[in-house]
Amino acid sequence: MRKIFNVLLITAAIATSCGCSKKTVVPTPPADTTTVKTHTQSPPGDVVGKVIVGYQGWFAAIGDGSPINRYWHWTQIWEQEPSPTNTGIRSWPDVRDYTATFPTQYSNLNNGQPATVFSSFSDQTVDVQFKWMKQNGIDGAALQRFNPSGLEGPVRDAMAAKVKTAAEANGVKFYIMYDVSGWTTMQADLKTDWTSKMSAYTTSPAYAKQNGKPVVCIWGFGFNDDNHNFSAADCLDVIKWFQSKGCYVIGGVPTHWRDENSDSRPDFLGTYKAFNMLSPWMVGRIANANESDGFFVNVNKADEAYCYGNGIDYQPCILPGDLQGRQRAHGDFMWRQFYNMKRAGAQGLYISMFDEYNEGNQIAKTAESQAFVPAGSNFLALDEDGTACSADYYLRLTGDGAKMFRGEIPITATRPTKPMP
């Protein structure tokens, strides 16, 4: 998602609120002396007690039959094929499970196979990706919905229908997650889009319900940047409007929402408190296990306590790490977050993201070694630190993290998932 903010802002946020940075080592809290909180606001449902992945579904290609008919999100210049000088991604996908792929201007993979990419518009692509979710114990997907007007509107509408079909076929829940970044008439557009288009999906047996209500998430209220210029009053109006329509409303909010500083606008706490569930953003905030520990001690525990004290469910983010930035530590970084958020007492977990090849934070199948990367492309593979990992490793790791979160396996600071099955 388009959610990485100014580096100086992020650095300041980590330093002031966590007492740590990439150069500061925070001791790991002892696993055997920490009590796991069991706070609950809402009973188990389709988001409480569950692990949800953020699902972009925003890749297309020329010739895929999509309304956009461009290399949507694969490239900077969508009208041209992906190439080393025209790319929009940081990680290379593993495409072996897809029946239809599309050409690029990259050299062949190092194994000699053509370097091709998938299209999210293909029914088989969406189906196989939701099959991966089901096979790996992922409970649901939050379909990202950016401003559905203009050039991207028709393909985004089509993706909602495709996600519904795939979710129903594979027994995976889904819900709509609006990203309001850059919306200029946000209040009216959200209400119109929900009323005229998206609310119809709530009749699907696969549409997520919590407390008997259809789930909708709004990402972007309160962020302190020029892409989210909304007043607290306007945002509160939208939250209350969705709730008046019978929805359970999740807020994708700034990391420092509770203190109303750094990435959060001031005077927004009353708006944040109106959400039924809060999911603070974490991409760009931590890059290793030590920093996850720092956030657990200095931010997550206090966030959970505040939510509990105010009748709000808490759904923190977990990320695999930017592969190209060498953050993953063959899964140890992500596992530490599962461990810490379980100890924090979170009511739900949000994985950011499923298919975020653009920022290198995807858990979907990825090139496992240089054999599956275009020759001369400089993309790192999952084995970048010398540990061999299967293409589906982060799907399997997420599945084990979900089992631990749901109490199906004991809590442990030691990653149980083997990089190679």
Language model segments and positions:
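Sec-dependent signal peptide recognition
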Residues: 2-10
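Bacterial Sec-dependent N-terminal signal peptides
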Residues: 4, 16-41
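Alpha-helical transmembrane segments
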Residues: 11-15
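Glycan-processing catalytic domains of CAZymes
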Residues: 29-421
